[in-house]
Amino acid sequence: AHFGFGMKIIFSDPYMPSDEVIKKYDATPCSSVEEVLEKADFVSIHCPGGESTYHLMNKERIGMMKKGAYLINSSRGDVIDNDALIEALKNKTIAGAGLDVFEGEPELNPGFLDCENAVLLPHLGSASIETRIAMGMRVLENMEAFYNNQEPGDRVV
């Protein structure tokens, strides 16, 4: 984000990175998650799932975000309260969300389908049925080429 988009990085982390890392990214530590939520235009969640982070982003915390802010989650689905996020998206409490993990996966809360301000992707894009079929077909093509004394398209040396 810093180098690619020129974004100013602010963060809250219980495991503070080294001064060298903070300086490298010209980052500013905040004293709490709440402080980040109040200041950030883009909030990107990076934490493990589990009891301590369950619904870390709940209705109250989502409500602390700027009206024009975007929430990004590629960590774990249960870190965000889906119902609270859907409500915030529909009410334009925040500008939008980008998600590739969802609470209750593999099921998707159908409320997300009515949110034009949400971008939804599979966490493991290569796990889609279409992609897996294409991968299998490619293996078969490589095997066929090999057994016909031809160069496989995806030769591994």
What are these model-predicted stretches?
Residues 1-67:
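Rossmann-like dinucleotide/phosphate-binding beta-alpha-beta segment
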Residues 68-157:
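Rossmann-like dinucleotide-binding domain for NAD(H)/NADP(H)
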